[in-house]
């Protein structure tokens, strides 16, 4: 007898056992995907006919907020997570669970930076405080030309108050 394997499992795209655990939680999912050139953050909820994506934030979305950064480094990941958190509040999302897909979660990594931004915006996600990157790395002090992330976040808050 030949066993049939799901096409997405065979291609290495979907880990169905991990997906089943996430869906059993009945929470909305905060999906983070790191690509070769950028970062994608989404909030999705389960539906019988397929997952329903509530919204998507990418590194390209930062331009709408007046931030001239692109890529998939820790600073961009933090800002994408923060904007995703702001969008979550607008859409009535109060809590979510992290969905990293097939990628491994690393303490202090880019996915952790995205999660930090999401939780800093006020959304509840189960996590340990020791998984986040250092504040120095989020502010970019290890770079030659650091970006002042804290100032950018303050500008986001001012824009929220005006709206």
UniProtKB/Swiss-Prot annotation:
Signal peptide: none annotated. SUPFAM superfamilies: Translational machinery components (SSF53137). One of its GO terms (cellular component) is cytosolic large ribosomal subunit. It holds the Pfam family Ribosomal_L5e. Gene3D superfamilies: 3.30.420.100. GO terms for biological process: ribosomal large subunit assembly; translation. Coiled coil: none annotated. It comes from the Archaea. GO terms for molecular function: 5S rRNA binding; structural constituent of ribosome. Keywords: Ribonucleoprotein, Ribosomal protein, RNA-binding, rRNA-binding. This is one of the proteins that bind and probably mediate the attachment of the 5S RNA into the large ribosomal subunit, where it forms part of the central protuberance. Belongs to the universal ribosomal protein uL18 family. Part of the 50S ribosomal subunit. Contacts the 5S and 23S rRNAs. This is Large ribosomal subunit protein uL18. It comes from Thermoplasma acidophilum (strain ATCC 25905 / DSM 1728 / JCM 9062 / NBRC 15155 / AMRC-C165). The gene is rpl18.
